[in-house]
């Protein structure tokens, strides 16, 4: 008895194009990536020239928000770097130049973490620093659940975590704040937070995500020292004074 052949193409249903929920603020595609890049670097008074001053403000649109497009190849790192260099050349003053240079440095961090993951793939499983692989974490599951759900009682932490779950995105400063809170206040293993971020981030990149978590935890390359703790109250007052 002969095995049945492959079905005809006409018999295969064409899947419907997925529709992103309105809460995800990143329309897909190369055209949208280029539109955002141009609006960030190309206007008469481009946002990138204020990047050094505005990038940590949670209440301003001071970042490029290009990370999902870099993550999925709608925009290449080379294209972003060329735009950053052009913005540096076009800077009318020292402050504007510093803004574009700061953005370029952030792009370099992204490439650096990719290199780290390539040469040291075990960072996805353990701390980069061998002497920090036996930390006695408390790993309270109830505290972790409250952190995931945005129910810690700290407004800036809770707002950031709810934004992540609802929209798939979180401001970089907020990522550092919530990561520090999880690791250094709740004493929960950074890998728990790393996995949760990868489950929800629309720009989730294994290299950048791991590098960011290990930096905050103090276990990675050129990481924040163990005694540097982001105070969520002070961070809120400084970077989101009106609670936007």
What spans do the regions from the language model cover?
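Glycine/tryptophan-enriched, flexible segments
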Residues: 1-127, 131, 239-244
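Short, hydrophobic/aromatic alpha-helical segments in well-folded domains
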Residues: 36, 65, 80, 103, ...
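Short, well-ordered loop/turn and helix-capping segments at boundaries between secondary-structure elements
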Residues: 86, 109, 118, 122, ...
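C-terminal substrate/ligand-recognition segments
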Residues: 114, 119, 142-188
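Helix-loop-helix junctions that connect adjacent transmembrane helices in secondary transporters/permeases
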Residues: 122-151
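C-terminal, helix-dominated tail/subdomain
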Residues: 132-138, 196-244
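Extended hydrophobic-aromatic, low-complexity segments
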Residues: 170-173, 187-195, 205-210
């Amino acid at each position: 008895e002969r095995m049945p052949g492959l079905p005809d193409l006409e018999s295969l249903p064409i899947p419907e194009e997925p529709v992103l929920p309105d809460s995800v603020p990143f329309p897909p595609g190369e055209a949208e990536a280029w539109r955002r890049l141009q609006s960030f670097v190309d206007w008469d008074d481009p946002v990138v020239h204020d990047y050094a001053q505005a990038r940590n403000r949670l209440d301003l649109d001071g970042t490029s928000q290009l990370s999902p497009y870099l993550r999925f190849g709608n925009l290449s790192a080379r294209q972003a770097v060329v735009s950053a260099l052009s913005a540096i050349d076009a800077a009318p003053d020292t402050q504007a130049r510093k803004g574009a240079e700061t953005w370029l440095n952030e792009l370099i961090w992204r490439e650096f973490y990719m290199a780290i993951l390539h040469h040291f793939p075990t960072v996805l499983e353990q701390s980069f620093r061998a002497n920090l692989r036996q930390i006695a974490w408390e790993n309270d599951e109830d505290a972790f659940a409250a952190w995931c759900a945005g129910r810690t009682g700290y407004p800036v932490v809770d707002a950031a975590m709810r934004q992540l779950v609802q929209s798939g995105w979180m401001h970089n400063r907020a990522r550092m704040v919530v990561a520090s809170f999880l690791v250094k206040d709740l004493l929960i293993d950074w890998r728990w937070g790393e996995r949760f971020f990868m489950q929800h981030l629309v720009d989730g990149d294994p290299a950048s995500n791991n590098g960011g978590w290990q930096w905050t935890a103090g276990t990675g390359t050129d990481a924040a020292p163990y005694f540097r703790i982001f105070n969520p109250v002070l961070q809120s007052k400084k970077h989101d004074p009106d609670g936007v």
